[in-house]
């Protein structure tokens, strides 16, 4: 990608955020926290580039957080955990749905990636994946298809049912499977952001290449811990 093209694309990214106090953290109610990124911007190279990570975390995620704080300020939603709000999302303002989802989804996303990621899940999670999908390779193929075929912007998810079995789904925009508006509800244990801002600087329109690269940074111990906690 040329420097000129990068400059144009970054400009488009910035224009699309449309957040006040851009890149500056807003005061937050007790239940909301903008957590530090758990690794350096360049830590996931060469699979996810540093420039994308910096823009994604410092501008996009920060923007969702700032707008969420403003959306709940002075309402009965202020101070309540997002997971509680998600159960009645169909009754709440669109600004809470978009920015609450954006903040929660990205907080999970950063944690389920690691510079020491990749490989295969072990233990109970590995067994659950095999039981639910037949094999790890079959799971990867199904998840990759969900991510690659999600039209427009959205997320692909690995989720847990109440009985401990796993399923794959995708959601549009910043929705997630905890929301009562989701086509299929469950507990997400990891997700992949397939908005263009997550990959376009490096992969352009090759979303499939981005999805394939993602497997090299999946933090399986973190995903396993989330699975165990949800049981």
Regions found by a protein language model. Give the residues of each.
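Bacterial N-terminal signal peptides that target proteins for export
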Residues: 1-11
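Glycine-centered signal
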Residues: 2, 20-21
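Bacterial N-terminal signal peptides
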Residues: 9-20
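Feature for soluble, non-membrane regions of globular proteins
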Residues: 24-231
């Amino acid at each position: 990608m040329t420097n000129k093209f990068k400059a144009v694309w970054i400009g488009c990214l910035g224009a699309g955020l449309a957040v006040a106090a851009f890149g500056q953290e807003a005061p937050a109610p007790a239940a909301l926290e903008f957590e530090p990124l758990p690794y350096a911007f360049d830590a996931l190279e060469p699979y996810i580039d540093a420039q994308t990570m910096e823009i994604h975390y410092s501008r996009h995620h920060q923007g969702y957080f700032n707008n969420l704080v403003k959306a709940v300020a002075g309402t009965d939603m202020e101070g309540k955990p997002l997971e509680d709000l998600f159960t009645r999302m169909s009754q709440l303002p669109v600004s809470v749905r978009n920015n609450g989802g954006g903040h929660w989804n990205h907080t999970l996303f950063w944690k389920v990636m690691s510079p020491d990621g990749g490989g295969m899940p072990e233990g109970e999670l590995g067994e659950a994946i095999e039981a639910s999908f037949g094999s790890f390779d079959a799971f990867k193929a199904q998840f990759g298809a969900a991510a690659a075929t999600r039209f427009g912007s959205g997320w692909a998810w690995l989720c847990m049912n109440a009985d401990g079995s796993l399923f794959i789904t995708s959601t549009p925009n910043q929705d997630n499977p905890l929301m009562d508006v989701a086509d299929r509800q469950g507990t997400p244990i990891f997700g992949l952001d397939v908005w263009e801002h997550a990959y376009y600087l490096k992969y352009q329109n090759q979303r499939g290449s981005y999805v394939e690269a993602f497997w090299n940074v999946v933090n399986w111990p973190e995903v396993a811990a989330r699975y165990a906690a949800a049981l």
